[in-house]
Regions:
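Short beta-strand-to-loop capping motifs
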Residues: 159, 195, 329-333, 373-379
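ATP-binding N-terminal substructure of ATP-dependent carboxylate-amine bond-forming enzymes
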Residues: 1-99, 305-306, 313, 331, ...
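A conserved helix-loop-beta module that forms one wall/lid of the active-site cleft
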Residues: 87-154, 161
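Active-site "cap" helix and flanking loop/linker of ATP-utilizing ligase/carboxylase catalytic domains
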Residues: 237-257, 264, 274-334
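Short, conserved charged micro-motifs
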Residues: 56-57, 131-133, 164-165, 334-340, ...
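Internal nucleotide-binding/catalytic subdomain
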Residues: 155-268, 277
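Glycine-rich active-site loop/lid that clamps phosphate-bearing ligands
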Residues: 329-359
Length: 426
């Protein structure tokens, strides 16, 4: 009997378990949380109460139970545990530890970009001593960030030496590494491109633009969507270098994304990569947009089913008429969650998927996501209508009765981008 072990519950865990079960695979979920707190356990055939940090105990249990596949949802910690367990047990991982390293060390990733002349933001060397001559050589404004964290954790934007000193110390306090990146602050539009990999070949699934609500922090991307301009330019001018980079990294199977900015100098710059599914869960609406099922792809890889180039979808070459969207539910307030409203109602809409991260009683931090809603539509107007419906319906309230979720309302801007993208196709 094939047995798949899912490490914890995070984005996409339930969907991966359900798909594995549809193949007749016996599914197990493990962590030290009750099923009500680790909901993938509620859909699995079996669950264990072993913390995913306890690798030795998990290895022993996997051998005893003859586990044949190990995977996880969107959790970098659990992905690293899966890599280690698969290595010990001789099981299949979609990526190697060596390739995964470039997702976790932004400094080494930038060094690899330099090696192949891929465009990246200018770096400034700052030692832990924070010497004045080093600080004086910096061209402000800059971004300061840890090499090993994602999701905007530990990041600061600095306009002078005093801010840089504090930001450097803050980044160190957040990180397990003593390496800190100080680089030119890019200003402009942001994207990430998602790729599928099969036996060493890579194919661009989609270029995803990232939009923040005006007046809120620019890194709180409330709407991530295939609605974009500059798509043909990216596909023709930037994508070949990115594919070269991913092959240099060692991306052979699975899913990988690479983040970019188009700076004020009208040049694209690579920011970072993630050898995993994206936190905005754009892989969910790709199934409707492209006919490509990321969940199926990753579960099959974990089960040892090999893919080849013929199974990859045709790469994107221009802006899509149809849309795929991931709405990340960012907060602009903090507090204890007292009430969740509208999640079930929105989930009943055809093609809409809802991933909720919080339950009543949980703490919500300011400027952190509390959930994701994804969908695909045939037209821009349908996309805008769903976003408006989410704004009206979905609420995450704190102890003061305040809705903590940022709403996206800049539809005129989105429509202009959509029209420009399609015009560029001509």
């Amino acid at each position: 009997m094939r047995k798949l072990l899912m490490l914890g519950t995070s984005y996409a865990s339930c969907e991966m378990v359900k798909y594995a079960k549809s193949l007749g695979v016996h599914t197990i979920v493990t962590d030290d949380l009750a099923p009500e707190q680790s909901v993938a356990k509620l859909v699995a055939d079996e669950y264990w109460m072993i913390n995913t940090a306890n690798v030795d105990e998990l290895e022993k249990k996997c051998r005893e139970e003859n586990v044949t596949a190990i995977c996880c949802g969107i959790s970098e910690f659990n992905l690293e545990v899966a890599l280690e367990l698969n290595k010990r047990l001789g099981l299949k991982s979609y990526c190697t530890p060596e390739a995964w390293h470039f997702s976790r060390d932004k400094d080494d990733f930038k060094a690899l970009c330099r090696k192949i002349n891929a465009p990246i933001a200018k770096d400034f060397f700052i030692s832990k001593e924070l010497r004045d001559d080093e600080l004086d050589a910096v061209e402000y404004p800059v971004v300061v960030k840890p090499v090993d964290l994602s999701g905007n954790r530990g990041i600061s934007y600095c306009n002078n030496k005093e801010e840089l000193r504090e930001a450097y110390k803050y980044a160190l306090s957040c990180s397990k590494s003593d390496k800190i990146i100080v680089e030119k602050q890019l200003k402009g539009e942001e994207w990430y491109a998602t790729y599928a990999c099969a036996n060493g070949d890579v194919s661009l699934l989609a270029l995803n633009a990232m939009y923040a609500q005006p007046g809120e922090p620019k890194n709180c991307y409330t709407v991530t969507t295939t609605v974009s301009r500059h798509v043909k330019r990216f596909c023709n001018d930037v994508n070949p270098k990115v594919e070269e980079l991913l092959k240099e990294v060692g991306c052979t199977d699975g899913i990988v994304w690479v983040q970019f900015m188009l700076d004020e100098d009208d040049k694209f710059y690579i920011i970072e990569m993630g050898y995993r599914m994206d936190g905005e869960m754009m892989f969910m609406p790709y199934k409707d947009l492209l006919g490509f099922d990321t969940i199926k792809w990753l579960v099959e890889t974990a089960l040892g089913i090999e893919h080849d180039k013929s199974q990859l979808p045709a790469p994107q070459t221009e802006a899509f008429t149809k849309t795929a969207t991931g709405m990340e539910l960012w907060t602009n307030k903090e507090g204890t969650v007292t009430k969740l409203v509208g999640y079930d109602e929105i989930a009943k809409l055809p093609g809409v998927f809802v991933e909720n991260l919080k339950q009543p009683g949980d703490k919500a931090m300011k400027y952190r996501p509390v959930g994701v809603i994804t969908f695909a539509t045939d037209t821009f107007e349908e996309m805008a209508d769903i976003i408006k419906k989410v704004n009206e319906t979905v609420h995450c309230c704190n102890e003061n009765g305040e809705d903590m979720i940022i709403k996206y309302t800049d539809f005129d801007y989105l429509k202009r981008i959509y029209d420009e993208g399609l015009k560029e196709n001509a």
